[in-house]
């Protein structure tokens, strides 16, 4: 968030590396990400102390919060649904993301709750850590790549008209 340190995911020879590059000192600090097969997307928390990832582990994509100082992570979703494009809200206590989940509960029985063919937006409270998410959209179209604009508005991509548009 300060613009001084850039976080970069690098894939090299089958391994994943998280690089922090300081633009002022030109220093590069890297750590191997052993737990993940692939990191699909990531973004900083507003205070710059955490990263939120959409990452693949054992063939499923879930949301993880990485503590930069401690170099540890916390898995916040763990189910068969595709959880993509996570971003912290401007207060940093919630995460907005896209998912093909058919309900608003984390870790539900797959036999009764099959994944949808489209992506909706969901909000996850990182402090209360309840198993229930807040569903933001519920449409037959895809809503993806949500970015919180402020404490009320979220911009996202939607293919509602057959063409992908940015909606606020």
Predicted regions mapped to residue ranges:
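A flexible loop/linker signature enriched in serine peptidases of the S9 family
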Residues: 1, 7-19, 32-39, 52-64, ...
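Surface-exposed loop/turn elements that mediate protein-protein interactions on large endomembrane-trafficking
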Residues: 21-28
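Generic detector of contiguous secondary-structure segments
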Residues: 70-93, 151-153
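Conserved beta-strand position repeated across blades of beta-propeller domains
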Residues: 43-45, 87, 147-148
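Short coil/turn segments that connect the beta-strands within blades of beta-propeller domains
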Residues: 2-4, 47-49, 91-93, 151-152
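Secondary-structure-rich domain cores
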Residues: 26, 68-71, 130-131
């Amino acid at each position: 968030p300060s613009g001084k340190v850039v976080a970069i995911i690098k894939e090299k020879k089958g391994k994943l590396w998280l690089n922090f590059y300081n633009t002022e000192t030109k220093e590069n600090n890297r750590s191997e990400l052993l737990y993940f097969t692939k990191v699909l997307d990531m973004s900083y928390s507003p205070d710059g102390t955490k990263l939120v990832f959409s990452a693949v582990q054992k063939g499923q994509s879930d949301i993880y919060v990485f503590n930069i100082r401690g170099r540890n992570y916390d898995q916040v979703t763990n189910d068969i649904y595709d959880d993509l494009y996570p971003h912290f809200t401007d207060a940093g206590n919630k995460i907005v993301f896209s998912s093909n989940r058919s309900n608003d509960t984390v870790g539900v029985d797959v036999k009764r709750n099959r994944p949808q063919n489209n992506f909706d937006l969901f909000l996850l409270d990182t402090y209360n850590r309840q198993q229930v998410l807040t569903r933001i959209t519920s449409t037959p179209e895809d809503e993806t790549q949500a970015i919180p604009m402020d404490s009320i508005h979220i911009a996202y991509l939607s293919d509602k008209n057959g063409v992908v548009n940015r909606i606020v």
